[in-house]
Amino acid sequence: KDLLRRRDTMPDVTVKAIEDMEPIYGGLARRARAELGVSAWGMQVFTLPPEWDGYPNHNHSSDAFDPNQEEVYIPLSGTATLVADGSEFELRPGTMIRVGPDQLRQILPGPEGIRFVAIGGAPEAFTPGAWTELGADPPSPPAE
């Protein structure tokens, strides 16, 4: 009988196609966190073109625009190499890579490019950066 009970509220579920999410950096990234209403961690979707070398070598140390944040990269399609201190790690669908906040990292897309989800969070309570809100100006890429 309980299964047939009518629900008076909508489920707390958000569904959005990646292509319908607000683009930043000329479409290289999509504001997935804000579009889905996530409040517990940072999350963007990146689509990098083949063999592109413009993804910044960066970290999320205490003086970064997203400080003290470790990141997990989840490839959706394509391949890339994540470079950290001269070591190379393959990003491909079916793998996930975690990178600590102080670790410099750069992602170099393979011959077909790559689309991946980047999830970030810090040990303390998460506070979304103002730049991640819909319509906000993204930060300048870090200088190398």
What would you call each of these model-derived segments?
Residues 1-50, 55, 129-144:
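A short, N-terminal "cap"/entry segment at the start of jelly-roll beta-barrel domains
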Residues 37, 58, 63-66:
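Short loop/turn motifs at secondary-structure junctions and domain boundaries
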Residues 45-49, 64-82:
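Short, conserved beta-strand element in jelly-roll/cupin
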Residues 56, 82-83, 99, 105-111:
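Short beta-strand His + acidic residue motifs that chelate non-heme Fe in jelly-roll/DSBH
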Residues 72, 79-81, 88, 104, ...:
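Structural motif
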Residues 86-102:
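Short acidic-glycine-tyrosine-enriched beta hairpin
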Residues 108-144:
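Double-stranded beta-helix
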